From Swiss-Prot:
<dbReference type="GO" id="GO:0006412">
    <property type="term" value="P:translation"/>
</dbReference>
<dbReference type="InterPro" id="IPR003837">
    <property type="entry name" value="GatC"/>
</dbReference>
<dbReference type="Pfam" id="PF02686">
    <property type="entry name" value="GatC"/>
</dbReference>
<dbReference type="InterPro" id="IPR036113">
    <property type="entry name" value="Asp/Glu-ADT_sf_sub_c"/>
</dbReference>
<keyword id="KW-0648">Protein biosynthesis</keyword>
<protein>
    <recommendedName>
        <fullName>Aspartyl/glutamyl-tRNA(Asn/Gln) amidotransferase subunit C</fullName>
        <ecNumber>6.3.5.-</ecNumber>
    </recommendedName>
</protein>
<keyword id="KW-0067">ATP-binding</keyword>
<dbReference type="GO" id="GO:0050566">
    <property type="term" value="F:asparaginyl-tRNA synthase (glutamine-hydrolyzing) activity"/>
</dbReference>
<keyword id="KW-0547">Nucleotide-binding</keyword>
<dbReference type="GO" id="GO:0070681">
    <property type="term" value="P:glutaminyl-tRNAGln biosynthesis via transamidation"/>
</dbReference>
<comment type="similarity">
    <text>Belongs to the GatC family.</text>
</comment>
<comment type="function">
    <text>Allows the formation of correctly charged Asn-tRNA(Asn) or Gln-tRNA(Gln) through the transamidation of misacylated Asp-tRNA(Asn) or Glu-tRNA(Gln) in organisms which lack either or both of asparaginyl-tRNA or glutaminyl-tRNA synthetases. The reaction takes place in the presence of glutamine and ATP through an activated phospho-Asp-tRNA(Asn) or phospho-Glu-tRNA(Gln).</text>
</comment>
<dbReference type="GO" id="GO:0006450">
    <property type="term" value="P:regulation of translational fidelity"/>
</dbReference>
<dbReference type="GO" id="GO:0050567">
    <property type="term" value="F:glutaminyl-tRNA synthase (glutamine-hydrolyzing) activity"/>
</dbReference>
<dbReference type="GO" id="GO:0005524">
    <property type="term" value="F:ATP binding"/>
</dbReference>
<keyword id="KW-0436">Ligase</keyword>
<comment type="subunit">
    <text>Heterotrimer of A, B and C subunits.</text>
</comment>
Length: 95
């Protein structure tokens, strides 16, 4: 399979991209190089090779949920430019 300049122009039109003739030629040659590489990969003998979805055997390695002390409200609010009771006050950003 190979890509033609006409194919590149069509795909560019679908993507609402505009290329010069030189860019179309370059894109055509680059896409053809990629397709040639993929065809080479297709020639590799993979009989007996188990398909992988990941190179790691581990799945969802998570740490245990351990309760930790957090910063006290008073300490967190020490440098707050504006506060109300135990909350930060921020400027209104939504009308």
């Amino acid at each position: 399979m190979s890509v033609t300049i006409k194919d590149v122009a069509y795909i560019a039109e679908l993507a609402r991209l505009s290329f010069t003739d030189t860019e179309k030629e370059k894109m055509t040659s680059e896409l053809n190089a990629i397709l040639q590489y993929v065809e080479k990969l297709d020639e590799v003998d993979t009989d007996g090779v188990e398909p992988l979805s990941s190179i790691h055997d581990e799945v969802n390695v998570l740490r245990d949920d351990v309760r930790q002390e957090s910063v006290p409200n008073e300490t967190a609010l020490l440098n707050a430019p504006d506060k109300l009771d135990r909350f930060f006050r921020v400027p209104k950003v939504i009308g």
